[in-house]
């Protein structure tokens, strides 16, 4: 039994699980609550378990074994699976495969472990599900397909127009650990028009959709030509590595023979090394030529994209200026200037209304009066700055103080009234 990744809360409740493990009624109408309660428990649990275990397909017998509890298997799983097929959360593997073009079936069907297609009425209606019949989970397959597409677009393979079968397996090894899962994911990608498959000279080639492109384009002769060049470069690299290793080996053998005093064998090894080095030079020249062609193709592709961007920009600019002409622009500018002049005239006219009722002579006379008043204010004497009396003094004290500051003849005291001196 595969351990459940997350046991539901009811799993330890014997009474509740006894009910959930029991068989369904013959029809839902007999007991709606009983039927719906079991479905709400089992359907999410099956999907969660499959996703946690990394399963893209399941079988009835597998689920009965995985959900076995205290030696008992759930009795209603067949009914649950039939309901999931009706809802579309599960699909028979045969139905899933049959929806893809025959070009892919020639590859996928040899690797998928499925039963032969039996186009009987019962199979087409989905009324019977065998205990070992594979059932795929479309939701999980779509998630894996999206991961594979992201992996391709972020890997070094994105610069390859075509991938061979071995390269596809390398790309998807972590996401799809077995061939059956890989083919289900590739079938989904092909159904979504994210990949295109071609068989050529007994070799399967896959083309992935480019970044920011909705659907994959059919494999063209240009794609095949670039693929052949890349394969040729790869082959030359392998031969160069092998020739380099052979050259090093012959050098070591020549040194060994020379130390042993076998000069003839040492010279023979050196002659072979010369031939190998000549072959290395030829291989290197061929590889350089192929790399130069690939670089030119890449540059041409870049130029094509730039020209396409220019064309789109010109089309957008043309569309933006569709109803705009030089005459119309000049006419609009003239109208703007005309209305600006009109506004200036209106402002001047409105501001002159208040000035018409005021006599300029009166204004000038009023201004002169204001200036004269300012001059009078300026000519006033300064404010006295003598000492300030802080506290009142008695009359005698005040008299003595004034006498000290008055003239010697005492004229000031005589001018002061007598009552003030008392």
UniProtKB/Swiss-Prot annotation:
Lineage top rank: taxon: Eukaryota
Cellular component annotations (GO), alphabetically ordered: cytoplasmic side of plasma membrane; ESCRT III complex; multivesicular body; nuclear envelope
GO BP annotations listed: exit from mitosis; late endosome to vacuole transport; late endosome to vacuole transport via multivesicular body sorting pathway; nuclear membrane reassembly; protein transport; vesicle budding from membrane
Family (UniProt): Belongs to the SNF7 family.
Localisation per UniProt entry: Cytoplasm; Nucleus envelope
Disordered: annotated segments: 394-422
Coiled coil regions in record: 234-304
Stored Pfam families: Snf7, WHD_CHMP7
Gene: chmp7
Keywords: Coiled coil, Cytoplasm, Nucleus, Protein transport, Transport
Taxonomic source organism: Xenopus laevis
Highest classification ranks of the organism: Eukaryota, Metazoa, Chordata, Craniata, Vertebrata
Signal peptide segment: none
Main location: cytoplasm
Name used for this protein in its record: Charged multivesicular body protein 7
Function: ESCRT-III-like protein required to recruit the ESCRT-III complex to the nuclear envelope during late anaphase. Together with SPAST, the ESCRT-III complex promotes nuclear envelope sealing and mitotic spindle disassembly during late anaphase. Plays a role in the endosomal sorting pathway.
